């Protein structure tokens, strides 16, 4: 897959802000970031309020996703350009959602907000609304999603890639250092998992490293590209970034994101856990 199939540059984005069939969507960890300013014409998706089921711990389902996108003015024919802060980590999470519900016309803005702001490109404070559409999401593509039982059965068999920080992997922390240390009941990592922090795939300006650099990163860490691969983090957003790198940029086959991640696994009774590096 060519990079142009899944990524757009900031130059391209700025030249296509007014294109009728393109919808720019911002998705941030800090869901108030968009409210301060955003790329002109972009709409907002709140990863917690919009993409998570309000009752059970799971994604919104096919009907809910259809309603969400229809209400926000996105049609099945639109090309969606996702971007956000912190090297696009939650934008990559949303990208994986779109792929889960088989919306193929979706790309990431390489570098996200960070690159856009470093370039000094314009931002807007205008309120953006789009006319509602009748969006029809497809049934989820669970070939890109890993579930608990498959993960447990994959220990010492498939590639398990823990993309959290070394301190989370070793069990010193339960969550990134800037966040509350909560959600999972136990620290540590899944036995046989390789620790390759997600952020190593990005340059200082938030753009993705070259294919050659990325291939070397994962090969040097011992990842066997001939095996099936499951990536995980704490809640699935950082592992979505690595899923994007492995599948969409490097062309790995059979890569799944375990969105339950450590929040689920670290709270299970009786499953194997390892501490240390």
Curated annotation (Swiss-Prot):
Enzyme Commission number: 2.8.1.1
Pfam hit, one: Rhodanese
CDD domains: TST_Repeat_1 (cd01448), TST_Repeat_2 (cd01449)
Active site: 233 (cysteine persulfide intermediate)
Keywords: Repeat, Transferase
Coiled coil: none
Name assigned to this protein: Putative thiosulfate sulfurtransferase
Organism: Mycobacterium leprae (strain TN)
